[in-house]
C-alpha cells in the first residue's frame, strides 16, 4: 500500500538510501518519506546505525614458536553523515574488518613471547583499533571499541603451563611446610630446655632440703641420745631411706626401676663409700 501511494517508512536507528534511475540521490532519515516510483525513484536499501559486534578468531604464532588463537571483539557502527559511503563503498563490511584484524594481530603477536602476549593484550587491542579506525573511517564506519577477549594457546602448551603452575604452587607449599616444621622443632627444643632447667632447679632444691633435714636429724638425735655418734645416726638414716625406697618401688605396679645392689647389707657398703669419698676429699685439701 505504501508503494502504491509512493510512501515509505524508515525505522528508528536506520537510514534508507534513495536512488533515481539507479543513481544515488539522498539518505532518508527515520520517518515517512515520499518516493515517487513513477519518476524513477526507489529505495536501494537500508543501513542500520546501531552498534554491531564482530568476533574475529585469528590463529598465529608467538616469538617463542607457540601457536595461539587470539579472539578479538570489534564493536563498530555506520556514521549517519557518511551513510552513502558506508552503503556503496563496501560490499562485505565484516570481511573487510576481519582482514584488517588478521593483518594487525599477525604483525604484532609474532614479536612477543607467549607470556608477553597475555600481559600486553591491551596494547594489541589498541593497535588493532587504531588500524581499523584509520581504514574504516574512509568507508563511513566508526570503530567504537576493540577488545582482545581471549588468548588460547595450543592444548599441549596449555597443559604444560598448568603443570608448571601446579609445580610452582607445590614448591611454595613445601617451603611453607618445612618452615613451619622448623619453627615447631625450635619451639619444642626451647620448651625441653626450659623444662630441664626448671627440673634441675627442683632437684637442686630437693637435695638441699634433704641435706638440711639430715643435718638437723643428726644433730637432734646426737643431743637427745647420749653416746651416739654422727656415724650411727647416718647408718640409721640410710637404712630408713633404703626401706622407703624399696617400699615405693614395690608399690608401683608398672615401675621400671631396679635397685642394685638390692640387699640390706648394701646400705653399709654405700655408707662406707660415702665416708671414704669424704675422707679422700679432706686429704686432698
Curated annotation (Swiss-Prot):
The keyword Lyase does not apply. It comes from the Eukaryota. Keywords: Coiled coil, Lipoprotein, Myristate. Gene3D superfamilies: Band 7 domain. A lipid is attached at residue 2 (N-myristoyl glycine). Induction: Up-regulated by pathogens during an incompatible interaction, but not upon infection by a virulent pathogen. Up-regulated by salicylic acid, abscisic acid, ethylene and methyl jasmonate. Pfam families: Band_7. Constitutively expressed in stems, roots and flowers, but not in leaves and fruits. Changing residue 2 to A: Loss of hypersensitive cell death induction. Residues 118-190 form a coiled coil. Homo- and heterodimer. Interacts with LRR1 (via LRR domain). Positive regulator of hypersensitive response (HR)-like cell death. May be involved in potassium ion channel regulation. This is Hypersensitive-induced reaction 1 protein. The gene is HIR1.
Amino acid at each position: 500500500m505504501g508503494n502504491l501511494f509512493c510512501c515509505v517508512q524508515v525505522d528508528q536507528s536506520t537510514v534508507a538510501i534513495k536512488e533515481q534511475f539507479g543513481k544515488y540521490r539522498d539518505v532518508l532519515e527515520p520517518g515517512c518519506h515520499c518516493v515517487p516510483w513513477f519518476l524513477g525513484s526507489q529505495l536501494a536499501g537500508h543501513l542500520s546505525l546501531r552498534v554491531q559486534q564482530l568476533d574475529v578468531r585469528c590463529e598465529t604464532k608467538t616469538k617463542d614458536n607457540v601457536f595461539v588463537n587470539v579472539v578479538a571483539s570489534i564493536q563498530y557502527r555506520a556514521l549517519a553523515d557518511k551513510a552513502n559511503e558506508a552503503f556503496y563503498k563496501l560490499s562485505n563490511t565484516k570481511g573487510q574488518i576481519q582482514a584488517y584484524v588478521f593483518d594487525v594481530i599477525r604483525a604484532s603477536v609474532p614479536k612477543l613471547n607467549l607470556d608477553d602476549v597475555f600481559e600486553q593484550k591491551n596494547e594489541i587491542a589498541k593497535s588493532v583499533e587504531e588500524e581499523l579506525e584509520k581504514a574504516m573511517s574512509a568507508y563511513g564506519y566508526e570503530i567504537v571499541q576493540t577488545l582482545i577477549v581471549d588468548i588460547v594457546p595450543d592444548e599441549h602448551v596449555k597443559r604444560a603451563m598448568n603443570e608448571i603452575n601446579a609445580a610452582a604452587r607445590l614448591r611454595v607449599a613445601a617451603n611453607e611446610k618445612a618452615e613451619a616444621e622448623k619453627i615447631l622443632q625450635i619451639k619444642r627444643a626451647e620448651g625441653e630446655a626450659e623444662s630441664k632447667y626448671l627440673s634441675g632447679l627442683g632437684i637442686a632444691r630437693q637435695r638441699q632440703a634433704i641435706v638440711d633435714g639430715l643435718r638437723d636429724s643428726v644433730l637432734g638425735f646426737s643431743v637427745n641420745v647420749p653416746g651416739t655418734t654422727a656415724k650411727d645416726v647416718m647408718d640409721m638414716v640410710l637404712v630408713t631411706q633404703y626401706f622407703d625406697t624399696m617400699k615405693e618401688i614395690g608399690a608401683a605396679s608398672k615401675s621400671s626401676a631396679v635397685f642394685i645392689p638390692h640387699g640390706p647389707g648394701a646400705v653399709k657398703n654405700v655408707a662406707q663409700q660415702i665416708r671414704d669419698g669424704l675422707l679422700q676429699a679432706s686429704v686432698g685439701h
